């Protein structure tokens, strides 16, 4: 479940820290969150798609590591990010 170019650009614009920021941890977490959301809805319809389930778990782990990095750098950035994305963190 990939994101198309316009969705990616919207996420980048919403979460970038400066004008040319396309790969900061905040942007990566936002993209992973969107991909996780799409894949979760796919798995609700296709419950026996085990390879996609494994990919989902890998994405969740990657997002968790990135959130840990952001939290280590700045608690305020972390709390702002999880509030903006609506995730538990």
Curated annotation (Swiss-Prot):
Alphabetically ordered keywords of this record: Ribonucleoprotein, Ribosomal protein, RNA-binding, rRNA-binding
GO biological process: translation
Statement: the UniProt record of this protein carries the keyword Signal: no
Pfam family, one: Ribosomal_S15
PROSITE patterns: RIBOSOMAL_S15
Residue stretches of biased makeup (Basic and acidic residues): 1-10
Signal peptide from the UniProt entry: none
GO MF, any single term: structural constituent of ribosome
Subunit relationships: Part of the 30S ribosomal subunit. Forms a bridge to the 50S subunit in the 70S ribosome, contacting the 23S rRNA.
PANTHER family documented for this protein: RIBOSOMAL PROTEIN S15, BACTERIAL AND ORGANELLAR, SMALL RIBOSOMAL SUBUNIT PROTEIN US15M
Family: Belongs to the universal ribosomal protein uS15 family.
Protein name per Swiss-Prot or TrEMBL: Small ribosomal subunit protein uS15
């Amino acid at each position: 479940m990939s994101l198309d170019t316009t969705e990616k650009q919207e996420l980048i614009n919403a979460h970038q820290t400066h004008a040319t920021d396309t790969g900061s941890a905040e942007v990566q977490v936002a993209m992973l969150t969107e991909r996780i959301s799409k894949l979760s809805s796919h798995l609700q319809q296709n419950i026996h798609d085990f390879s996609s389930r494994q990919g989902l778990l890998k994405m969740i782990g990657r997002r968790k590591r990135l959130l840990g990095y952001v939290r280590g750098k700045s608690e305020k950035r972390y709390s702002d990010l999880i509030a903006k994305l609506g995730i538990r963190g």
